[in-house]
Amino acid sequence: MKLAVIGGDGIGPEVTAEALKVLNAVRDDIETTDYDLGARRYLKNGELLTDEDLASLREHDAILLGAIGAPGSVPPGILERGLLLKMRFALDHHVNLRPSKLYDGVESPLRNPGKIDFVVVREGTEGAYTGNGGAIRVGTPHEIANETSVNTRYGAERVIRYAFELAQSRRKKLTLVHKTNVLVHGGGLWQRTVDEVAKEYPEVAVDYNHIDAATIYLVTDPSRFDVIVTDNLFGDILTDEAGAVSGGIGLAASGNIDATGTNPSMFEPVHGSAPDIAGQGIADPTAAILSAAMLLRHLGDEDNAVRIETAIAADVAGRDNSQPISTTEVGDRIVKALQS
């Protein structure tokens, strides 16, 4: 396996090191290439993501990312658009995959959360995040700004098909989330596409929630969900709420996936770079290790993905949450569990 590694900023390199430690415990064929991408490189020479970087990344089977960001040093939007979004569009990461699971031993902010185990499949390259818009008369009382949400049948269908395949392998329930009563054009396209693709998956039960209803159900009845499929903007909202109800983004992993396999997909923890605790050895690497398990599953190594997830579940359930996390100790415990 040829693996591109982007440690990034803050705690990113620390948690990525533990994810690699775990990967190497279950596989002996991993060849890694490290990439200096993120705030550090930008502040040093102004570079974000060059054509040469992209060409080199494309030579790998997958990408493992730690965290990107330097709040206070780099203005908002520069790293997001110049690095992360550029990579997403260049590598056609049209599926953003966000599992949400409440592990034993983890406290949810919900009083009676029930069983939380669902996945959000978010479209990643269309919608309101394409940069299609503009502004005139900026800074005047007559300023006008618009953002155009772009939805194509091709873009929606490939993500919807991915979601149906995922639902088929899980509990066989898919929920479309949109706002079809108001966003009649884009929402109508999504609804029609789901209805048509659903005919090919008769075993999958399909329902629909408006985005406002879905945000309520995530708090009042999260166990109703199995696979949620939605567009870019609504997915951005739902995935963070999903992370919150299942114990926080410290345990949240994600995948940015080219489902065709043409380009390497990228896997990363949801948390940020947390520069305030960087270098102290107290960052929780669990989400990064879960991201590594997602990476293996994407590449077809289901057995080792399950082994890692099982070891993580046991480790999380057995933690003394009154004690501080040790980054390296978490990685060591999971490796030991895998080797026992």
Swiss-Prot record:
Organism: Corynebacterium glutamicum (strain ATCC 13032 / DSM 20300 / JCM 1318 / BCRC 11384 / CCUG 27702 / LMG 3730 / NBRC 12168 / NCIMB 10025 / NRRL B-2784 / 534)
Its job: Catalyzes the oxidation of 3-carboxy-2-hydroxy-4-methylpentanoate (3-isopropylmalate) to 3-carboxy-4-methyl-2-oxopentanoate. The product decarboxylates to 4-methyl-2 oxopentanoate.
Enzyme class name: oxidoreductase
SMART domains for the chain: Iso_dh
The protein's name: 3-isopropylmalate dehydrogenase
Keyword set includes Hydrolase: no
Record GO biological process: L-leucine biosynthetic process
Cofactor: Mg(2+); Mn(2+)
